Amino acid sequence: MDESSLEHKYKLLQRQYDFCKIKADTVTQRIKAIEDVSAALFVEWESELNEYSNRSLKARSRQQLKLSQQHYARLIKAMQRAEARISPVLMAFKDQVLYLKHNLNAQAIAAIEHEFIEISLDMSQLIQAMEMTIAEASQFVASLSEQKALPGY
């Protein structure tokens, strides 16, 4: 797979992962909100039972409360089981996205290694040119020294 295709696939999967992560977080928040609202509803219902003057209505309301709490408990457990399955799937998805990203990183390192080889060659040529220039300068300085040493100048 060529680099641009790999990068395109990575970016696409990363966007999809981000979207799924947001959706998973939203599910968690909604379940929490349902739990909070339900808890408040049941507390209020329980406290209002004492406001009944009619025993029969109070008993029926208490029975309805009990049935509603049981129904709620089944529903919330089902939601929590579904939510618990989200995390492993999301983690496996993230693993795949990270692996793809790291393949891109490996390709980038390979490109850097190629660049290093080119820079090394350029540096070798530069050092060679500098050594030649230094040698020429040394010869020139030596010739100047010889001219000073010659008598009559």
Write out the residue ranges for each language-model feature:
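Extended alpha-helical coiled-coil scaffold domains characteristic of the BAR superfamily
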Residues: 20, 24-27, 68-86, 123-137
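Glutamate identity and glutamate-enriched acidic tracts
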Residues: 3, 7, 35, 44-48, ...
